[in-house]
Amino acid sequence: MVDNTYGHYAYRISGGYLFHSVPYLKAANNTLETEEYNKLGTFASLGCVRMCVRDVLWLYENCPQGTTVDIYDDAANPGPLGKPESIKIPLDSPNAGWDPTDPDETNPWHKESATLSGVQDITVKVGDTVDFLKGVTAKDTCGNDITDKIAVSGRYTTDAAGEYTMKYQVTDAIGSIATAEMK
């Protein structure tokens, strides 16, 4: 690639334009240019389409040569699948240098996952109001705050005494899911 960098699963679109992973400094899975990875979803290349390893590998394995691909370049109409969200890698992470979606079995991100914290059983008096998200936080696989993505489900009423179960779930940008319950 350009500037003596490397890419995984380069797949030609047309001419000099490719689908490929974010650049790597060497031909090794742990040399990802993390700053460039964090630009996924923005204009950051010389015309190629940069993707996380999971997605470009899917194209590489599932789209034979000659497959028609429609590329959307319109924020108002990002296509039928929408614009994918990307996860950000903290530059000071000991796992920086690895794409969190790389299926390589030695990828240290595979030991990480989305998390929920602060979910605990509570007691509420009849007639009181309750904030099920009070004190509850969530982090994605890379440790970024995704508290605003928490979904809470369950049936309850504060009009009558009883025991109710509420379920919490959060899914991060790479599909890692954390769940918890409280009563």
Regions from the language model: what does each represent?
Residues 1, 125-129, 161-162:
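Solvent-exposed, conformationally flexible loop/turn segments
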Residues 2-112:
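Exported/periplasmic cell-wall-interacting domains
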Residues 18-19, 130, 146, 178:
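Short, isolated positions in well-ordered beta-strands
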Residues 57-58, 139, 172-176:
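Short beta-strands and strand-coil junctions in structured, solvent-facing domains, enriched
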Residues 111-144:
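Solvent-exposed, low-complexity, repeat-rich "mucin-like" stalks and linkers
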Residues 122, 144-182:
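Serine/threonine-rich, repeat-prone extracellular segments and beta-strand-based repeat modules
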